[in-house]
Structures are given as C-alpha cells and as structure tokens.
Amino acid sequence: MPSYSRCVESLPRSALALTALFESIKGKCTGLSVADSTPIAVCDNLRIRRHKVFDGIAERGKTSTGWFFGFKLHVIINHLGEILSFRLTPGNTDDRKPLPELIKDLSGCLYADKGYLSASLKQQLKTMGINLITNIKHEFRTNKKTLYF
C-alpha cells in the first residue's frame, strides 16, 4: 500500500484514468436531473504557499462554509442517482460557468441550488429544452407588503 505522500504525488497522473472510469459508468437522462458542486480541497489554507502538487492548477475558492484551496467538482445526476455529466474546475470557478457544457445531452427539468440562479442562464437553458428550477434568492423575491392593524 503506497504512503500518503506517494498517493498525493500520483493524483495528477491518475486524472485521465479517473475521467475514463466516470465516463464509462455514466447513466441515461430521465428528464429529472439535479446539478450541484462540491469543493475538493487539496491542502489546508495555512499551507497554500507551500503546496506544489497542483501548483498553477488549483485555485482559492469560497463556499458557504468558508475559503478553500483546490478544485470544484460539478456534477449532474438523474433522479436515480446516476452520474450524467461532471467537470473538475479550479476552485474559483462560478457554479454557473460550466453548466451549459454539462447539459449538452440533457432534457427536461434540472434542479439546482441558489448558486445557479441567473435570469440569462435560465433563458439560455430554456432555448436548449431544459427547465432550470432553483430556489429564489432574497434579492429576486418580490416585495410583498402587508398591512398590520
């Protein structure tokens, strides 16, 4: 069994093999899909300056829980939990940016969180036959005024 440092050193070389594995186990589009992203930190924030394995590839990113240094894994799954498409991007990539590339072979409804909310993206996906369903951010809600007596 290889040591941790040897395993970390081999990660960049194994990216192609992992991509081929994921491509071979992809599921079929069922009309109901879910999009999300998750951070993949490659080192602790205190060690960013000393990190050399993914130097020039990994970037600093921010999530709802704080800052990290590494990558973002963007995944779209169907309602059965099968992976339909995925991309690995630097940590500073906006969630909305890789979405048009991820949905090339999809149709139907795509559920996503607030990170994917954009009027222009929703319109772009609608022209491609995909209905993007997201939560409503507070800025986009209509102000409902009520009278209190």
Residue ranges, per PLM feature:
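Short alpha-helical elements
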Residues: 1-149
